[in-house]
Amino acid sequence: MRNLPIIALDFKSADEVHTFLNKFNEPLCVKIGMELFYQTGPALIKSIKKRGHDIFLDLKLHDIPNTVSKAMEGLARLDVDLVNVHAAGGIKMMEEAKKGLRKHNADIKIIAVTQLTSTTETQLHEEQNIQTSIEEAVLNYARLTKKAGLDGVVCSPLEAEMISKELGTDFLKVTPGIRPKGAARNDQQRITTPEEAKTLGSTHIVVGRPITQSEHPIDSYHKIKESWLS
């Protein structure tokens, strides 16, 4: 996966995606989530790959180990660049996910979601019944992910630094919750700017609405890209 800001393609149709991508004349890294994938299926992935873009397929698989393994066998054939599972599924599920992926593709990176960046500490305690801080809950899931042999985690940039210190800088930290200065928070709770994310140890950042809903998406993307790579 190129070290570029990953644009979250939060659109409802393939036509909207291609209209957006047609504005750009350069290789991009993009994220396809559940909403878009369930609407468009593998056909959109193939068309985006033909354009030369890298793809993070963000489906957050979470099921029994055998089911996730078989699902990963199918996703491996799509030739995306990055896939993910939920760390809450446990070590065995994550190990089987990687095995399923490797049956057909040795190059796709696989990471695990720790806690969503929309999760608050109150929700963690009262709804998930995890009686630790968010930071400790995230770090615990990151430890399990590395033990399972995966390539990294999805986490808030606010947690990237502590994960790097314990699990190493080569362990991927893919961080949503990125907002340029002055941008709306939307439904994100644990956020930083691109510059802060880099300082904290994020290896990749995911940015959606500040680019896709911008009146000038190319300019917005290039400003974020410049601040991330500088």
UniProtKB/Swiss-Prot annotation:
Top-level enzyme category: lyase
PROSITE patterns named among the record's database cross-references: OMPDECASE (PS00156)
A GO term for molecular function: orotidine-5'-phosphate decarboxylase activity
Biological process terms in GO annotation: 'de novo' pyrimidine nucleobase biosynthetic process; 'de novo' UMP biosynthetic process
Key words, A-Z: Decarboxylase, Lyase, Pyrimidine biosynthesis
Pathway this chain belongs to: Pyrimidine metabolism; UMP biosynthesis via de novo pathway; UMP from orotate: step 2/2
List of residues binding substrate: 10, 31, 58-67, 117, 179, 188, 208-209
Location of the active site: 60 (proton donor)
SUPFAM superfamilies, per database record: Ribulose-phoshate binding barrel
Cellular component per GO, a single term: cytosol
EC numbers on record: 4.1.1.23
Record's function text: Catalyzes the decarboxylation of orotidine 5'-monophosphate (OMP) to uridine 5'-monophosphate (UMP).
Subunit structure, as described in the record: Homodimer.
Protein family: Belongs to the OMP decarboxylase family. Type 1 subfamily.
Protein name (Swiss-Prot/TrEMBL): Orotidine 5'-phosphate decarboxylase
Source organism: Staphylococcus epidermidis (strain ATCC 12228 / FDA PCI 1200)
